[in-house]
């Protein structure tokens, strides 16, 4: 913000700062984005805090620092309340930030387990990059796509497939069309 205010002042030929409009708002909020165990957080701990309002250790996804208790997300609360839930992301859908809304893992790198928890969530919509580590050979379950389909998800590759299937699908996952 300070750099933008200095740049704006320089463009107008003024030495110093030219306040941006939001810097003049009458109220200010302060957020502390550190993890429970480190001053600098990662996206798993930050996503967990965003999704649940609870701090956790870096690297942990949807779990409390005691390493035993799940941090219930607002998306899970909405689902329990009978609401339809959708999760959208620009990254792989089983990465830390989107995963923090439906998964509970001691390691953000448990992509296979995170994918399985996506399928178990019952959320009606997921959209994002494909599954990371979708075909982990250590597991004999057919991979993340098959697990999701076996759980009743329709997988749409691209917007045209989404439009063709959205009305009839109870649960759908939208991924970019592969070239």
Which residues make up each language-model segment?
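N-terminal catalytic scaffold of extracellular/periplasmic and nuclease hydrolases
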Residues: 1-137, 142-166, 170-171
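Active-site-adjacent mobile loop/cap segments within catalytic or ligand-binding domains
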Residues: 176-179
């Amino acid at each position: 913000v300070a750099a933008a205010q200095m740049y704006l002042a320089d463009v107008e030929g003024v030495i110093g700062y030219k306040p941006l409009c939001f810097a003049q708002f009458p109220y200010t909020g302060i957020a502390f984005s550190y993890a429970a165990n480190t001053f600098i957080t990662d996206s798993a701990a930050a996503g967990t805090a965003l999704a649940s309002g609870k701090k956790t250790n870096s690297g942990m996804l949807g779990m409390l620092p005691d390493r035993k208790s799940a941090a219930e997300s607002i998306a899970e609360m909405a689902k329990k309340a009978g609401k339809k839930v959708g999760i959208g992301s620009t990254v792989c859908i089983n990465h830390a930030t989107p995963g923090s809304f439906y998964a509970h893992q001691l390691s953000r790198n448990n992509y296979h387990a995170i994918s399985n928890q996506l399928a178990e969530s019952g959320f009606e919509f997921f959209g994002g990059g494909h599954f990371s580590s979708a075909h982990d050979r250590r597991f004999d379950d057919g991979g993340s796509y098959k697990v999701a389909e076996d759980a009743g998800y329709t997988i749409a590759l691209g917007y045209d497939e989404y439009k063709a299937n959205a009305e009839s699908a109870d649960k759908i996952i939208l991924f970019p069309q592969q070239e």
